[in-house]
């Protein structure tokens, strides 16, 4: 019983530290210098897996590896910004440059070889409208 309590306590501490690290990573002031690969590693691979092959279990996490839907650069950009189903929106957490960087990384890696890239100015068109509390 004591071992079980210890395992649960250590798991909770590890989870809290991981959530804190993710929250720190998403701070726009600190994250402006990160690469698309780093964004993928810290944000995307938790669900889509390090190899981009996705997962099925408690939920369905689509594969990004060898994904023909990524042929249209707008598709992953819209998904990152707006989310869909279990995929959360990252429009408030990521800048236009960060969205472009992570989309370009995924489209050029993980078995994908799309060479056309998005620029930060392309991302603005895909952003959802600002809510009243974001305007302030």
Give residue ranges: language-model regions.
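Flexible coil segments in periplasmic/lumen-exposed cytochrome c-class electron-transfer proteins
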Residues: 19-26, 96-97, 101-136
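Gly/Gly-Pro-rich "capping" loops immediately C-terminal to redox-active cysteine motifs
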Residues: 53-93
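Stable alpha-helical elements in mature extracytoplasmic
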Residues: 32, 72, 76, 98-99, ...
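The canonical Cys-X-X-Cys-His
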Residues: 36, 40-50, 102
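Positively charged n-region of N-terminal signal peptides that target proteins for export
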Residues: 1-4
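Hydrophobic h-region of N-terminal signal peptides that target proteins for export
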Residues: 8-18
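Electrostatic cytochrome c docking/interface patches
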Residues: 17-39, 55, 136
């Amino acid at each position: 019983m004591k071992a079980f309590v210890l395992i649960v306590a250590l798991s909770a501490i590890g989870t809290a530290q991981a959530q804190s690290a993710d929250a720190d990573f998403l701070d726009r002031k600190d994250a402006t210098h990160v690469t698309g690969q780093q964004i993928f590693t810290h944000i995307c691979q938790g669900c889509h897996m390090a190899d981009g092959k996705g997962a099925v279990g408690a939920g369905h996490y689509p594969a990004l590896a060898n994904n023909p839907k990524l042929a249209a650069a707008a598709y992953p950009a819209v998904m990152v910004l707006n989310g869909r189903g279990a995929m959360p929106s990252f429009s408030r957490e990521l800048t236009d440059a960060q969205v472009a960087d992570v989309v370009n990384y995924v489209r050029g890696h993980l078995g994908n070889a799309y060479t056309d890239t998005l620029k930060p100015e392309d991302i603005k068109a895909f952003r959802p409208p600002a809510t009243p509390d974001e305007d302030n």
